[in-house]
Amino acid sequence: MLPFSQQYSEETLIRIQQELDLNCPSPESNLVKLGRCVATLPGSEEAAKLRRLVMDIDDFTAQIRWHLGQALLLMDSQPDILKAGEDDDDIIKGLGMPAGAQLLLRGYIRDADRVLYDDLSTSRLGGTVGGWIFHMMIDSAVYRAVSVLDRLATVLWYAAELPMERIYFRSGKVKKLHTAFCSDETAHLLRIAEGKLLNFIIDYRDGLTHSTKAYSRASGFTPLEQWKDENGRLVIWDENAWDAEMLFALGRASYLQFTEALGPSVSICEKKWPIQP
């Protein structure tokens, strides 16, 4: 069972939608304005790419809110997600489960390769199916939030008429945009790009994409590694497991970084491509 196939009552869906709207409000008016800026640009390859970028931004915004909405539904319907790890042994709670042990026992775990379930409270590798899906929802929301910021930076790159290159919403690229526009809007965008919060979010996304994913207790045991260095000192590699509240906070923060950047970006686009009456 996936969270979106569960039979939630209309009352529950309305309540969770209200909670989503409160915590992750839709930037509807800015999305409409951004679309109108590029909708009637004369036909050209650049205009076509701009319109596709803006359509991507629109759809990704809805996708992020969908994932965060599903996460809220899971926290509401599966309270074990919020309580995960409370009853753990102190050693497991403090350090995690040795990764070597998890890998050695992998072949002996009952139904270890099962990925489809009809009960979200089913145990799975030390967590629950609901917790496993919950973490995936947050990871997907974070991934999309960084992706939509990169597309937003590309739209602004076209507006600045800068030579095309690989564009990302990072401080180096946004500095070039600020040099081109030298505006209050790009100064705001630069503060976002240079901020500790966005860089933390990007580091999380990069770990997920390229190196080591984060773990949460709700989705299973956190892997523990330890060894001795060249000086004989014990080294313990143990990343603290994320709890559900902090994971949702990460997803929400990622989304709100995008919506904060969207407002000044739309202002820039309205000046570059005035909305036609």
Task: Please provide the spans of the model-predicted regions.
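Short, positively charged
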Residues: 148
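Acidic, Ser/Thr/Gly/Pro-rich intrinsically disordered interaction regions
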Residues: 1-139, 143, 154-277
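Extracellular acidic loop/turn motifs
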Residues: 151
